[in-house]
């Protein structure tokens, strides 16, 4: 887009609101094309997709379990799937086939998912040479555990524990164009800590950034922009700000302010790129009106 910093401040646009109230467990993921798929959460199995072309929501087959806090979706473009964890203190783990629009359950999670739980898939369709068989799972909610799921083996392996317990608002993102060996992990639980997990070394290190002045907790979520090596981060519930972490410099900078606060433990962010246009979509995560979906143009 032919826009410039300062002269063209990012404009927050109101999109079609969700047909159902959002809450703990609302989880979104872009499929790389026309749709953002989303679990409603709110202790329900409702599943939808949002058409970024037509600004319209569509009902889809229900998830195999009720989703709540800790639910999350992860795209697997090489298999044309979305992987999903249940949250809600459950061990449900499944995938949604984007071709047949059907669900299939797989091995149960080795530890219950709840506040701060996350999954990361290292996909060779996103980065050549990545191990396409792996999904990493952190139960968080006071646990420092990390597991690796083998898709071919349908089994979990315990890995090195995080340096400290992960809490509500923890999230992991695979920063594959910055370093394909690393998963960036926001610790959550009200702390300012951010870690890097080395996939090859099965080891953890601190990620230094500035200013490290905000404690991430319930409601935090993050998405990665592989074009710029920025990570977009929403803060804890009750805030209106989206920040942006520059991985190359370690600087945490403001990106935009939303019209209203966002709430609940929702995986609310989706970064969508179609042609030369890129937008950050934000699902508010609140059970009361307006059931907002916003988008912000990303042009610098």
Please report, for each region that a protein language model flagged, where it lies by residue.
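Blade-level signature of beta-propeller repeat domains, shared across WD40, Kelch, NHL, RCC1
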Residues: 265-300
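Short coil/turn segments that connect the beta-strands within blades of beta-propeller domains
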Residues: 33-34, 78-80, 131-133, 180-181, ...
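Short glycine/acidic-enriched loop and turn motifs that connect beta-strands
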Residues: 42-45, 88-91, 141-144, 189-192, ...
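Solenoidal tandem-repeat scaffolds enriched in leucines and small polar residues
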Residues: 123, 137-138, 146, 171
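Trp- and S/T/G-rich repeat-edge/linker motifs of beta-rich repeat architectures
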Residues: 3-22, 45-68, 92-115, 145-167, ...
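Loop/turn-rich, solvent-exposed surfaces of beta-rich toroidal or solenoidal domains
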Residues: 217-228, 232-240
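Repeated scaffold domains used in trafficking and secretory/extracellular systems
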Residues: 21-29, 66-74, 114-126, 166-175, ...
